């Protein structure tokens, strides 16, 4: 079991991307440390793009998940604006921020899973 503040999993999920794409997933489970409790993602650079937040437990089949916008408090499965987003990830294996539509801009998503 993790001790709060002892370890975090940091991933650049999308890096100045100018197209649709799956990006890199953020692992919510570490063999040495167990499950992380929360994942927080920072989205920057959106101009005309949509990010769909998704997760899986089998490493293959992705399902849209609700994330909380930490600025507005609103929960949604997508965003079209920059911001900080959080989701409880206990029990999930991976989370991704898929760019599901894109017209312009260079979108970056950075994620960290922590206990």
What residues fall within each predicted segment?
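Conserved Ser/Thr-centered positions that define the repeating blades of beta-propeller domains
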Residues: 54-56
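Extended, low-complexity, turn-rich repeat/linker tracts enriched in Gly/Pro/Ser/Thr and Asp/Glu
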Residues: 43-51, 102-107
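Transition segment at domain starts
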Residues: 1-35
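Beta-strand secondary-structure signal
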Residues: 40-42, 52, 96, 110
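Tryptophan-centered short beta-strand motifs
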Residues: 10, 58-69, 73-75
């Amino acid at each position: 079991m993790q001790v709060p503040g002892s370890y975090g999993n940091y991933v650049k999920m999308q890096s100045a991307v100018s197209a649709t794409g799956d990006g890199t997933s953020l692992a919510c489970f570490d063999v040495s440390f167990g499950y992380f409790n929360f994942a927080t993602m920072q989205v920057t650079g959106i101009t005309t793009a949509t990010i769909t937040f998704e997760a899986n437990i089998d490493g293959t089949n992705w399902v849209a998940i609700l994330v909380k916008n930490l600025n507005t408090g609103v929960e949604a499965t997508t965003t079209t604006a920059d911001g900080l987003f959080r989701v409880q990830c206990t029990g999930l294996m991976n989370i991704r921020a898929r760019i599901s539509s894109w017209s312009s801009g260079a979108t970056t998503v950075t994620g960290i899973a922590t206990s």
